[in-house]
């Protein structure tokens, strides 16, 4: 998703849906200023992409996410891994920590994760 559409989805994921346009606008405008018409255009695009469902309540449209944040994250992560790192998890992790100090806790977390993957493969 483009950044502006992702911003709208983050509002929906991080709040209790369904939300109307004014509620979305109130949250999003704490970070950046978007006109109501821009928000409506972004919501229409998200509906066309089947990311949100629109239901009517009187004269008001309510927006509910159809794609969960975890599903989106998994899809995007896999896409980045494939396109930028040739499906190499090692290259991906190396690029994340290149030149940065890694805490013992992070090393342990990675080690535990790899052990879990190894156990699943058995």
Provide a role label for each language-model segment.
Residues 54:
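Short beta-strand "wing" residues that participate in macromolecule-binding interfaces
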Residues 1-4, 57-76:
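Short, cationic-aromatic polyanion-contact patches
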Residues 6-11, 23:
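Pre-recognition alpha-helix immediately N-terminal to the DNA-recognition helix
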Residues 40-44:
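Short, hydrophobic-biased segments on the C-terminal half of alpha helices
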Residues 18-28:
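Short acidic, hydrophobic short linear motifs in intrinsically disordered regions
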């Amino acid at each position: 998703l483009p950044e502006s559409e992702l911003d709208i989805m983050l509002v929906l994921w991080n709040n209790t849906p369904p939300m109307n346009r004014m509620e979305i606008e109130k949250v999003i405008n704490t970070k950046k200023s978007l006109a109501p018409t821009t928000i409506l255009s972004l919501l229409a695009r998200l509906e066309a992409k089947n990311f949100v469902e629109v239901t009517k309540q009187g004269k008001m449209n309510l927006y509910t996410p159809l794609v969960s944040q975890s599903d989106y994250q998994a899809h995007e992560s896999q896409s980045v891994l494939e396109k930028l790192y040739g499906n190499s998890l090692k290259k991906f992790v190396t690029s994340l920590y290149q030149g940065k100090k890694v805490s013992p806790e992070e090393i342990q977390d990675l080690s535990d994760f790899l052990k879990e993957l190894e156990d699943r493969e058995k």
